[in-house]
Design a protein with these regions (language model features):
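Hydrophobic alpha-helical segments, chiefly the membrane-spanning helices
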Residues: 1-305
Length: 305
């Protein structure tokens, strides 16, 4: 029964995030909010809503291992699998701003997280620092985007009542689904005698990263593979700065030694992705395949450690 409810939780997370994004984007169109701002805020937060719901629910429940490992595992999955699969399907040239600004920032943020983890905890003050950095980053992105704004085609606009219904229903599904996933994953971990850290790094991390994976594959099939890298990097920054920051502010997180090791491995994957993107300023199919194989090796390492 736990497995069925876990699956139901994942479905609620993914579909809830989809409805939340669609309703929010439609409301923005009704209110004439620039689409670029929606892309940087609502859509980014919507696709990471499953991770946010799981980690924040885990922090409230005192399941620190899941709160941390969900974010670290999701970020490793985004960097290696999401980008890797898209590059394997179709090699692409990363956008200049991502190479010059966002990828180095992603590495820097991961380094800071490693340093914060060294004392074995993520305090409320450290969480507040991460949240402040997220606000500053969003503020800069919005300022930069509005300064150099290029208006695109308006997206699908629903009626106002339907938009509000999508937002409320989607948010409720994400919150309830996140609570269900955390609860059932903890029970399954206990039954099998495996750690919450392992469950968070694998099953939960992959499940909550499905919106990013699906979005990126669809973009690749439409010939816009370069968006895959932007989606992965943007989601990873949001996961660390907002989700871990908010989780720590709600309840200070105890960090296991294994989590420090996993975060160092996350840093390694971020650096590797940057190197691949810089070489020839193109992510090739062979580099994409290498990323996916590295994730398979990492998963095998989790099984045996």
């Amino acid at each position: 029964m736990e497995y069925i409810l876990l699956l139901v939780g994942f479905i609620l997370l993914i579909k809830g995030a989809d409805f939340f994004v669609e309703g929010s984007s439609s409301l923005a169109g009704i209110l004439k909010v620039p689409s670029v701002i929606i892309g940087l805020t609502i859509v980014a937060m919507g696709t990471s809503a499953p991770e946010a719901s799981v980690s924040i629910n885990a922090a409230l429940a005192g399941s620190n291992d899941i709160a941390i490992s969900n974010v670290v595992g999701s970020n490793i999955f985004n960097g290696l699998v999401v980008v890797g699969i898209c590059a394997f399907l179709h090699s692409f040239m990363p956008h200049g701003e991502i190479l010059k600004r966002d990828m180095p920032l992603n590495i820097l943020v991961t380094v800071v997280l490693c340093l914060m983890f060294l004392d074995g905890s993520l305090s409320r003050i450290e969480g507040a620092v991460l949240l402040f950095c997220m606000i500053a980053y969003l503020g800069f992105m919005i300022y930069s985007a509005r300064k150099n704004r290029e208006e695109g085609e308006p997206g699908k606009i629903l009626s106002l009542p339907r938009s509000l219904l999508y937002i409320a229903g989607g948010l409720a599904a994400v919150i309830f689904g996140g609570d269900l996933v955390v609860d059932k994953a903890c029970i399954i971990a206990t039954n099998f005698g495996v750690s919450q850290n392992f469950i968070g790094l694998t099953i939960i991390a992959i499940g909550t990263s499905l919106p990013e994976l699906v979005t990126s594959i669809v973009a690749t099939k439409k010939g816009d593979s370069g968006l895959a890298l932007g989606n992965a990097i943007g989601s990873n920054l949001f996961n660390i700065l907002f989700i871990l920051g908010m989780s720590a502010v709600i309840s200070p997180l105890h960090v296991l030694g294994e989590s420090v090791i996993d975060t160092v491995l996350l840093l390694g994957s971020a650096i590797l992705l940057f190197v691949f993107a810089r070489t020839g300023r193109r992510m090739t199919r062979s580099e994409g395949a290498a990323c996916v194989l590295l994730y398979v090796a990492y998963t095998a390492y989790l099984f045996v450690r």
